[in-house]
Amino acid sequence: GVRNEAFMNLFDILGPVMVGPSSSHTAGAVRIGYISEKLLQDHVRKAEILLHGSFATTGIGHGTDKALIAGLLGMHPDDIRIPASFDLAKKVGMEFTFSTVTLKDAHPNTAVLRLSGEHGRKIEVQAASIGGGRILIAKLDGIEVNFTAEKPTLIVHNVDQPGHVAQVTSMLAERNVNIATLQLYRDKRGGYAVMVIETDQEVPQDSVEWLEQLNGIIKVTYINVED
């Protein structure tokens, strides 16, 4: 009957996303989009997405492409609207393109997302789906980093001069925020450095704003995915 047919159609739509061996990487792709949008700290107006490795060979049409866009729209991996993400993106005026790329020394399930926001913010994120719906952020704006975004994470771009690490760590200590990991990356050519700090507690919003106005701090990004 009609009802049975409707059910079949729904199953056809949801099938590739919910079942099968690719589902953990589909979940990973949604999370890559979701975290990238949080890192942009703005609604995505334009996305240029490059797929590498097995994402490039199976990504288009296997749901990876739709999953990435769904994440950029703020969806979670269990959202039933994922298969319709392209249409939903068009409705909110998000432009997006997909192409393939070959990266050196990158994980096989890797995507590079070049994003522009509604308020002029821009970011380039290179991230990998590492299985089980987990992801690894490998590069931010061309600088190699290494974090999962599973804990509250504070990312500080600053001019590479003494004192900035101490400013940030002492501020966190004052606010009783415990540092779980601190990684420091330096871009010799650009003369700036990036701190990636994972914390055990949330970082208060006013602390983030205080950091932003410090001399020599270029950009502060804070994500707490419990949001």
What residue ranges belong to the model's regions?
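Short, Lys/Arg-enriched N-terminal segments with co-localized hydrophobic residues
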Residues: 1-7
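Conserved phosphate/anionic-ligand binding catalytic regions in large, soluble enzymes, centered on
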Residues: 15-33
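Generic secondary-structure signature for well-ordered alpha-helical cores
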Residues: 19, 35-42, 73-77, 91-95, ...
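Non-transmembrane, aqueous-exposed alpha-helical and coiled segments at domain scale
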Residues: 39-48, 108
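A structural-propensity feature for long, helix-poor, extended segments
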Residues: 48, 52-91
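Short glycine/threonine-rich loop-to-helix capping motif typified by GTGT followed
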Residues: 58-66, 108, 194-201
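Contiguous domain-boundary segments centered on the initiation and propagation of an alpha-helix
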Residues: 73-123
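A conserved regulatory-domain signal marking ACT and ACT-like small-molecule sensing domains
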Residues: 84, 98-101, 125-227
